Amino acid sequence: MDANSIDILLVEDNIDDAELTIRGLKKYSMANNLFHVPDGEEALDFIFATGKYLGKRDILQRPKLILLDIQMPKLSGIEVLKKIRGDERTRLMPVVILTSSREDPDIKKCYELGVNSYIVKPVKFDNFAEAIKNLGFYWLLLNQPPI
């Protein structure tokens, strides 16, 4: 897949959760241009075209949506969100937290940092797939981004 034609960047360390998300998006034909990275550090490399993505990606080719977990190795989703919102080139990118954390401090911190939406992953696959369908439909088809 061309790293410059990504609609969704999925940042998820749990392979089972990543697979469920991808399956949910595929079920509704919204996973054609999805790219998955397993941690926050690689997410920033991808977004900012650094590290192993240096010379392979154009930073101006932004994903239409970033689905971001909070609890990850190397760099948390909150730290990734801070970096995205702190850079003029990426501060308007749509970021949706997709996590199992229902902790009020996590929710509050993410909204303070400018997250577009905070979604707690439903436990049942059918509910999860429906949530993913609605999320993809809204962010990829209905939403009009400023960029």
Regions found by a protein language model. Name each.
Residues 1-9, 15-35, 41-44, 48, ...:
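Non-catalytic signal-transmission and effector/linker regions of two-component phosphorelay proteins
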Residues 36, 74-75, 92:
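Residue-level signal for the "D+5" position in two-component response regulator receiver
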Residues 57-61, 85-92, 113:
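Conserved phosphotransfer cores of two-component systems
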Residues 70-72:
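Receiver (REC) domain active-site loop signature in two-component systems and cognate sites
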Residues 116:
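Short, glycine/charged-rich "phosphate-handling" switch motifs in NTP-dependent
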Residues 121:
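A Lys-centered signature of the CheY-like receiver
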